[in-house]
Amino acid sequence: MIALVQGRVAAIGLDAVVVVVGGVGMRVLATPATLAGLRVEADCELHTSLVVREDSLTLFGFADADERDVFELVQTVSGVGPRLALAMLAVHTPDGLRRAVAQEDLAALVRVPGIGRKGASRIVLELGDRLGPAQGAAPAAPVAVDDGADVVDALVGLGWPVRQAQDAVRGVLEDADGTAPDAAGLLRAALRSLAGDARG
């Protein structure tokens, strides 16, 4: 099993990063939050999980070992594969998932694309207390992002032109109707906007 990858970032996409290790470029799928912390040509360290299928080998990368361990544990639930597990961690932090399961918060779980109420109930039932208690303090209320500068930097690091990144962040903030998204939420919304523009 490949549990850790250290190397130079060669390229960053919307859902994956290419890390050069010993002259070999390894494509690693990751969440937007993990990708936002990487920079092209910079060194990185990712905790990884290798998913082996009959016709493929897919590497998933995470900012820390806890996130990787939660990714692997949620896949023990029937119907939850690696892609859905990654989507869960794109929407929730590991502690966010722990709280949702412990509190049987189905509404929080169905916010993940691909999970309905029946699937959320199954996740709560099958995981039970296996995720363990939350390791950090409860999340603070969302903090207003004044100008989205950090998110713009993250989008530029993902390969988007500065002007396009600024326009996407500005559009999300204008559509927020006075609510204050946190940085991760703003990044996800901006990525959706940019992906829609690219398809259009």
Swiss-Prot record:
GO terms for biological process: DNA recombination; DNA repair. Residues 64-138 are annotated as: Domain II. Residues 138-142 are annotated as: Flexible linker. Residues 1-63 are annotated as: Domain I. One of its GO terms (molecular function) is ATP binding. Residues 143-200 are annotated as: Domain III. Keywords: Cytoplasm, DNA damage, DNA recombination, DNA repair, DNA-binding. Its main location: cytoplasm. InterPro entries: DNA_helicase_Holl-junc_RuvA_I, Hlx-hairpin-Hlx_DNA-bd_motif, NA-bd_OB-fold, RuvA, RuvA_2-like, RuvA_C, RuvA_C_sf. It is found in: Cytoplasm. One of its GO terms (cellular component) is Holliday junction helicase complex. The keyword Cell membrane does not apply. Homotetramer. Forms an RuvA(8)-RuvB(12)-Holliday junction (HJ) complex. HJ DNA is sandwiched between 2 RuvA tetramers; dsDNA enters through RuvA and exits via RuvB. An RuvB hexamer assembles on each DNA strand where it exits the tetramer. Each RuvB hexamer is contacted by two RuvA subunits (via domain III) on 2 adjacent RuvB subunits; this complex drives branch migration. In the full resolvosome a probable DNA-RuvA(4)-RuvB(12)-RuvC(2) complex forms which resolves the HJ. Belongs to the RuvA family. The RuvA-RuvB-RuvC complex processes Holliday junction (HJ) DNA during genetic recombination and DNA repair, while the RuvA-RuvB complex plays an important role in the rescue of blocked DNA replication forks via replication fork reversal (RFR). RuvA specifically binds to HJ cruciform DNA, conferring on it an open structure. The RuvB hexamer acts as an ATP-dependent pump, pulling dsDNA into and through the RuvAB complex. HJ branch migration allows RuvC to scan DNA until it finds its consensus sequence, where it cleaves and resolves the cruciform DNA. HAMAP family: DNA_HJ_migration_RuvA (MF_00031). Has three domains with a flexible linker between the domains II and III and assumes an 'L' shape. Domain III is highly mobile and contacts RuvB. This is Holliday junction branch migration complex subunit RuvA. It comes from Beutenbergia cavernae (strain ATCC BAA-8 / DSM 12333 / CCUG 43141 / JCM 11478 / NBRC 16432 / NCIMB 13614 / HKI 0122).
